[in-house]
Swiss-Prot record:
UniProt entry tagged with the keyword Ribosomal protein: no
Keyword terms of this UniProt record: Amino-acid biosynthesis, Cytoplasm, Histidine biosynthesis, Lyase
Pathway info: Amino-acid biosynthesis; L-histidine biosynthesis; L-histidine from 5-phospho-alpha-D-ribose 1-diphosphate: step 5/9
An annotated GO cellular component: cytoplasm
Function per UniProt: IGPS catalyzes the conversion of PRFAR and glutamine to IGP, AICAR and glutamate. The HisF subunit catalyzes the cyclization activity that produces IGP and AICAR from PRFAR using the ammonia provided by the HisH subunit.
Classification via InterPro entries: Aldolase_TIM (IPR013785), His_biosynth (IPR006062), HisF (IPR004651), IGPS_HisA/HisF (IPR050064), RibuloseP-bd_barrel (IPR011060)
Gene Ontology biological-process entries: L-histidine biosynthetic process
Protein name: Imidazole glycerol phosphate synthase subunit HisF
Subcellular location: Cytoplasm
Record-level Gene Ontology MF annotations: imidazoleglycerol-phosphate synthase activity; lyase activity
Species, as recorded: Geobacillus sp. (strain WCH70)
Known partners and oligomeric status: Heterodimer of HisH and HisF.
């Protein structure tokens, strides 16, 4: 039986972890290396870092952060945000990341997925999809640029294409549920999980341990990601894992 993974997510801007509500009202949440060590001790299975600094200066800082984090961590970590070329992937992976996450760049240039998978192997390539339900198409639409721009892509079709091109994992964020803390988007997660052959990481909406149970059992997710509930200490990775274990979920 495949082990389910719990993954905290850190948004990094200019070398610091920040947290906000729907991409705005950002507040400093500390040093990424210290937080990474904290989550590692708590029993996180992996970590995701999203670089939200748009600046070139911020990008250099991110490489330094990745190097420092890699020196401290035993668990795998993924870095996303602003990775636009094979060279960008090389830089981040050489700095010590285990995987790179492609979002907007992959939509703009789907060939980037293929290039990355051919060069590094599918296990290094995560395609992140920001999804929002659209009644006009009766399904979910793909958004880019941090959820600001709607595309013509339908989520399930795009997820399948990403996997065909070599994505080893899909990081699926529900924009409808994000930050609401009312639970993950079960319908979205299940639909994508059943359509692709690679692991799906559910993201957006975690409010308590029960939500993780639901997304694993009903949403068929392989992993679940959360940010604010862990950062704000509303619950901990340890507590979530204990809750899941008691209910027979196979976790590390």
């Amino acid at each position: 039986m495949i082990t389910k993974r719990i993954i905290p997510c850190l948004d990094v801007k200019d070398g610091r972890v920040v947290k906000g509500v729907q991409f705005v009202q950002l507040r400093d949440a500390g040093d990424p290396v210290e937080l990474a060590k904290f989550y590692d001790k708590q029993g996180a299975d992996e970590l995701v870092f999203l670089d939200i600094s748009a600046s070139h200066e911020g990008r250099k800082t991110m490489v330094e952060v990745v190097e420092k984090v890699a020196a401290q961590l035993a668990i795998p970590f993924t870095v996303g945000g602003g990775i636009n070329s094979l060279d960008d992937m090389k830089t981040i992976l050489r700095a010590g990341a285990d995987k790179v996450s492609l979002n907007t760049a992959a939509v703009r240039n789907p060939n980037l997925i293929t290039e990355g998978a051919d060069f590094f192997g599918s296990q290094c390539i995560v395609v992140a999809i920001d999804a929002k339900y659209d009644e006009t198409i009766g399904s979910w639409r793909v958004y880019t640029h941090g959820g600001r721009n709607a595309t013509d892509l339908e989520v399930v079709e795009w997820a399948k294409e990403a996997v065909r091109r070599g994505a080893g994992e899909i990081l699926l964020t529900s924009m409808d549920c994000d930050g609401e803390k009312n639970g993950f988007d079960i319908a979205l997660t299940r639909t994508v999980s059943e359509a692709v052959s690679v692991p799906v990481i559910a993201s957006g909406g975690a409010g308590n341990a029960k939500h993780f149970l639901e997304v694993f059992e009903k949403g068929k997710a392989d992993a679940a990601l959360a940010a604010s509930i862990f950062h704000y200490k509303e619950t901990s990775v340890k507590e979530v894992k204990a809750y899941l274990k008691e209910r027979g979920v196979n976790i590390r």
